[in-house]
Regions:
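Conserved catalytic segments around the Walker B and adjacent sensor/switch elements
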Residues: 48-65
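Structural recognition of the conserved hydrophobic beta-strand(s) that form the central parallel beta-sheet
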Residues: 99, 123-129, 150
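Hydrophobic anchor at the beta1->P-loop junction of P-loop NTPases
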Residues: 31
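Short glycine-rich substrate-engagement loop in P-loop NTPases that contacts/grips substrate
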Residues: 61-94
Length: 448
């Protein structure tokens, strides 16, 4: 399991319940996402609660004997008898589930899903990281009998659940729906709470470290371990080290405030055209979130996507913070305390942009941004994110402070006025609506 010590409630559980009741064994469930986000844990917890029995086959540490069973599945009766004997678990028809954990490590097990699902005796749940699932599935017949579900780091609501707080998010939801400010005292506490989420992040290991130690250095070490694991995985994407270089440069790239990721700054003499396949693989791995420039933003943002212009974010903002201080042997508690108390240095203001990207992706939105050149052409106005909103679009400008200037938003709205549903400025002050603009505190982004 990815997180042995503790189980955290996750929203994906309800998605899994829906799959079980609606598909009734007609498909396997494939939970895909980055490493260390809790895929194995949720699969096992679901199996334990929702089935009479289950077998967990962890292909990262399975014996050659078990792995070899899937090289020849011509006799399913024999396969099931062997699995029951090896794991000492009795399987019950339509009441048991078999979990293929880290299924990418045994491609023939994934290929077998077609026949196992057709057999219909048991349910099947697969977990895998996209880095490996893509790279290791090229020589097999990928089954169509899969229901794929993306899993992300713990979102803010899941983080609050882990801390034993089930009341904050309903309050925020009601306030947002009623367009109500919460008042200075409440707002200050909510901002401090959200900054804590930004610092710890949503990786279960980091959250567990925070809960059990209340020590940011322990949290930071947990995050450094995850980053090291990701960087090792990036070698599977590109053994020249370019993926690792692109990832490590994310904080520096965002701090430059350039209109796109400057590949040549991260990798000397490299060009976007030569690196896009690596960027795509990184995006597919779900270790990063990538926002693409929309050249003519309108309904159907993907139709105007310019892949030569992109920005890259870490999939988890807690990892972003650790990545920003990676040169330090360990990020000291005092640094975290300063960040928690809103003493961000200027170049770390982009942690807010990263967390907005993370929140938008977790709510199922693809990431797009837009730039408009100044009249003199040397500078540009930038809308950080553009999201679909019913039959129109809504621009989002992000401020890492309470600063309410919104020239970019004004320029965008003037140019595309007939396409716009709502105008959002996300910042660090209380909610307000003024002159057609919604000023949304960062902790309410999930409701957009």
């Amino acid at each position: 399991m990815e997180q042995n010590e503790i189980y955290f409630d996750r929203k994906i559980y309800n998605t899994m319940l829906k799959w079980k009741s609606e598909r009734s064994g007609d498909t396997a469930l494939l939970i895909q996402g980055a490493r260390r986000i809790g895929k194995s844990t949720i699969a096992q917890e679901f199996a334990r609660k929702e089935y009479k029995s289950y077998i967990l086959i962890d292909f990262s540490k399975v014996s050659k004997e078990v792995s070899g069973l899937f090289n020849d599945i011509s006799d399913l009766n024999y396969l099931f008898l062997r699995l029951q004997f090896i794991y000492q678990v009795q399987l019950y028809e339509r009441e048991s589930v078999i979990i293929f954990d880290e299924v990418q490590l045994q491609p023939y097990a994934r290929q077998a899903i077609k026949h196992l699902v057709k057999d219909h005796r048991y349910d099947y749940i697969e977990t895998g990281s996209l880095i490996s699932v893509r790279s290791r599935s090229r020589d097999i017949l990928v089954p169509s009998e899969e229901t794929k579900v993306d899993m992300y780091p713990m979102d803010y609501e899941e983080f609050k659940w882990a801390l034993g707080d089930t009341t904050t998010i309903p309050l925020l939801r009601t306030a947002f729906e009623k367009k109500m400010p919460l008042g200075d005292v409440v707002h200050r506490k909510l901002m401090r709470d959200f900054r804590l989420y930004m610092l710890v992040g949503g990786m279960p290991q980091a959250v567990y470290a925070y809960i059990t130690t209340n020590n940011f250095m322990a949290v930071d070490q947990a995050k450094r371990d995850i980053i090291a694991l990701y960087e090792e995985d990036f070698g599977k994407i590109d053994d020249s080290g370019r993926a690792k270089a692109l990832y490590d440069a994310i904080p520096a790239q965002l701090s430059r405030n350039a209109m796109r990721y400057q590949v040549g700054k991260a990798i000397e003499e490299e060009r976007v055209s030569r690196i896009m396949n690596v960027v795509k693989e990184m995006e597919d791995s779900m270790t990063v979130n990538v926002a693409y420039h929309s050249d003519d933003p309108n309904t159907g943002l993907a139709l105007t996507k310019n892949e030569d212009y992109f920005k890259m974010y870490t999939s988890d903002t807690g990892l972003f913070v650790t990545l920003a201080f990676k040169d330090n042997k360990i990020t000291e508690n005092i640094i975290y305390d300063k960040l928690l108390n809103d003493k961000l240095s200027t170049n770390l203001g982009y942690v807010y942009e990263n967390v907005i990207a993370q929140v938008l992706r977790a709510t199922g939105k693809n990431l797009f941004y837009h730039t408009i050149p100044y009249a003199e052409g040397k500078k540009y106005y930038e809308i950080d994110f553009v999201i679909p909103d019913r039959h129109k679009i809504s621009p989002i400008e992000v401020k890492s402070s309470g600063y309410k200037a919104h020239k970019s938003l004004d320029q965008f709205c003037a140019k595309y006025s007939d396409r716009i549903m709502n105008r959002y400025l996300i910042y660090t002050k209380d909610y307000k609506r003024e002159n057609g603009i919604e000023y949304v505190p960062v902790y309410m982004t999930m409701f957009l």
